[in-house]
């Protein structure tokens, strides 16, 4: 067997310090294999034509981990990403990014379930707080609340516009005692024209 054509199962050490343990077919990584990268990360899973493709797991140098589907050497499809800071995302990925429908659970127990774009909530989603049964159900933009209903732990409900995660714009606030304010808001406070119903 010529040295340049690797086949079967074995270990290959690259000149840059990287190494591969697994199956070879006609000189390419094919099937199950484990790759240790120069940046300190490690991939263990399926290979097709020397690219990560299929099921696999990556452990990154910073402690982050991903387990799920790969396509053409990138995280693609369904998977679970566990951050070093203990945030856990389970859902869809596109070209190595959190993209699509998924669930993000924070270390404090807060949970967001809905649409993600570029790794942050964007689109329709439900954010549930771990304490007090508070939640926001509505539309997100760039990781911030944009429009929807917020349910407060005391029973109050706000339905309307948001800016920088504060009530801002037009909205209706229904108090637990059935009193209601409908009108304009600014930075979390009633501001401008509005109507109070007792």
Regions found by a protein language model. Name each.
Residues 1-198:
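Glycine/tyrosine- and acidic-biased, solvent-exposed loop/turn segments at the edges of beta-strands
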